[in-house]
Design a protein with these regions (language model features):
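Charge-dense, helix-prone N-terminal extensions
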Residues: 1-109
Length: 109
């Protein structure tokens, strides 16, 4: 199964306005990088987000959010948001801003 290209197109519309972003196909999906660090992407029909441990724990209490688990073992600091959780661009942009905020705390690669 491929990744949801519609979610990816919506992400690109938002992050293409940001500086220092890049995209890579990985893990059967697509990942987006900020200053060389992965911060979001699309896996199957999920938005994946790197929020850090504290940010991901806070996000897990929200509807349509679960731990990122694509290998059978949850990945700390990452979450997956179901498509129902990003039905409009404002919701998507808010999630991307959270991931961007965390990515900016990481050293550039």
């Amino acid at each position: 199964m491929g990744y949801d290209e519609e979610i990816d197109a919506r992400i690109r519309t938002i992050i293409n306005k940001w500086e220092n972003t890049a995209s890579k196909k990985m893990f059967g999906g697509v990942c987006h990088l900020l200053n060389g660090n992965m911060f979001c992407g699309v896996y199957k029909n999920f938005l994946i987000l790197r929020l850090g441990v504290q940010g991901s724990e806070e996000a897990l209490g929200r509807p349509y959010v679960k731990s990122m688990d694509i290998t059978g073992k949850p990945i700390k600091g990452w979450v997956m948001v179901q498509k129902q959780g990003i039905v409009n661009d404002e919701e998507l942009a808010a999630w991307l801003e959270r991931a961007k905020k965390y990515a900016r705390t990481l050293p550039p690669k």
